[in-house]
């Protein structure tokens, strides 16, 4: 059996209407994943795929995942999310769809737009280090090299201020609708001698599996299976889980004073097959002896007792760096929205606004600001209203990032930079 190709999770980011859905459709079509019968009519022929996914998501239908995977010579790609999707920003942050790389789509006619900036900033904040810039809709500017260079320059300046190394980022003139430079090299851009989009994807670096870090498995669901017992389900973020290991679930264990939430792993299952060991990226169900279905819940994190997950209780605080994405008025001290961190959702209080920061450079603009408005970044002190697991982003980034939600929208995004345990 041939070794499976390495796997990369890919996000498509960029301003609304710059052609992300069309590009996804074009990629899937040109790589043979979808056929003519899957396409729509006229201008929207490629968008249909993403629109269908969108509707299925909205209705809560299980998505046909075959339509979100494609292969290059070196890799198998999964398209983890497409913006435009209501919860895109939340998903991007909470790791429901942790991307390893992203394609930033910028329309040649519009250039950089507000969401171009927001998505690029988020990608950097979320640790997406590998970026490819697709300058799309070249057909609308008659494949003009000068216009391409203008937009390229504009995007490069933006990415530099955010902290990307622009020399390592491929910029590619494409037309998703016409198919130029997506999979096939285009005759319409004789002035361009770089890779096609597919070639650039094939040149990405594979993500490193953090197997040497302590075990962390945020729990998505807990099932009770007759004849088996309690089966928590989740994705291994860091470390390795083996049959026979003792695992502890936090904050369940701490919250019950150690009475509940620890047991022995009897079996591990992935894709309906039993496995002996699970690594980062594996979505697994595992049976734990000595843990009842009601002892643990979504938002708990499985870890090894000798390297337990960090629990922050209402007696503790943590310092976070956040950026306000959309707040109707302003955030002040005392504000208590819901923090979505890995699979946990916990109301947390803004204890103190420490300093306002320039989102591009990270420099301090103002000490102890009175409030924070949309577009501003800050360092803040946060106190959870109940125990939760969160890690410092420098230690375990997968569990250090969060989205802040209120009024049905993502208000802010951020990361935990320092945990302050009560002495």
From Swiss-Prot:
Keyword field: Cytoplasm, Elongation factor, GTP-binding, Hydrolase, Magnesium, Metal-binding, Nucleotide-binding, Protein biosynthesis
Region (G2): 60-64
Catalytic reaction equation(s): GTP + H2O = GDP + phosphate + H(+)
Domain tr-type G: 5-211
One term under GO cellular component: cytoplasm
Region annotation (G4) ranges: 136-139
Chain positions covered by the region annotation G1: 14-21
Binding residues for GTP: 14-21, 81-85, 136-139
Enzyme class: hydrolase
The enzyme's E.C. designation: 3.6.5.3
Cellular compartment(s): Cytoplasm
Binding site for Mg(2+): 21
Organism domain of life: Archaea
Region described as G5: 175-177
Similarity field: Belongs to the TRAFAC class translation factor GTPase superfamily. Classic translation factor GTPase family. EF-Tu/EF-1A subfamily.
Classification via NCBIfam families: EF-1_alpha, PRK12317.1, small_GTP
Name this polypeptide is given: Elongation factor 1-alpha
């Amino acid at each position: 059996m041939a070794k499976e190709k390495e796997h990369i999770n890919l996000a498509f980011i960029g301003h609304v209407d710059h052609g992300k859905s069309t590009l996804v459709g074009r990629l899937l079509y040109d790589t043979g994943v979808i056929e003519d019968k899957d396409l729509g009519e006229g201008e929207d022929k490629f968008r249909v795929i993403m629109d269908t996914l969108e509707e299925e998501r909205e209705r809560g239908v299980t998505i046909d995942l075959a339509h979100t995977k494609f292969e290059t010579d070196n890799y198998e790609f999964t398209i983890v999310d497409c913006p435009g999707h209501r919860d895109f920003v939340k998903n991007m942050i909470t790791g429901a769809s942790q991307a390893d790389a992203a394609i930033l789509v910028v329309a040649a006619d519009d250039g950089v737009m507000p969401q171009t900036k927001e998505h690029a900033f988020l990608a950097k904040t979320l640790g997406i280090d590998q970026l490819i810039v697709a300058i799309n809709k070249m057909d609308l500017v008659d494949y003009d090299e000068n216009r391409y260079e203008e937009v390229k320059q504009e995007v490069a300046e933006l990415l530099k201020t955010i902290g990307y190394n622009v020399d390592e980022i491929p910029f590619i003139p494409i037309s998703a609708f016409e198919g130029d430079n997506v999979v096939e090299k285009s005759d319409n851009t004789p002035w361009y001698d770089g890779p096609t989009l597919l070639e650039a994807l094939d040149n990405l670096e594979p993500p490193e599996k953090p197997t040497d870090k302590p075990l962390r498995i945020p729990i998505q669901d807990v099932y009770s299976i007759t004849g088996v017992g309690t089966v928590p389900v989740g994705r291994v973020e860091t470390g390795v889980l083996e049959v026979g290991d003792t695992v502890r679930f936090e904050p369940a264990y701490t919250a019950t004073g150690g009475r509940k939430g620890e047991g022995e792993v009897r079996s591990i299952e992935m894709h309906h097959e039993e496995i002996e060991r699970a690594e980062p990226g594996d979505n697994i169900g595992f049976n734990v002896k000595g843990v009842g279905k009601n002892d643990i819940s979504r938002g708990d994190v499985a870890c090894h007792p000798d390297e337990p997950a960090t629990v922050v209780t209402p007696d503790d605080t943590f310092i976070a760096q956040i950026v306000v994405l959309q707040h109707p008025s302003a955030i002040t001290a005392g504000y208590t929205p819901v923090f979505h961190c890995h699979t946990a959702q916990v109301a947390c209080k803004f204890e103190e606004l420490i300093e306002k920061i320039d989102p591009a450079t990270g420099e301090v603009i103002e000490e102890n600001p009175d409030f924070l408005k949309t577009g501003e970044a800050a360092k803040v002190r946060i106190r959870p209203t109940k125990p939760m697991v969160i890690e410092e982003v420098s230690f375990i980034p997968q569990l250090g990032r969060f989205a802040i939600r209120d009024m049905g929208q993502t208000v802010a995004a951020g990361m935990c930079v320092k945990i302050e345990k009560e002495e």
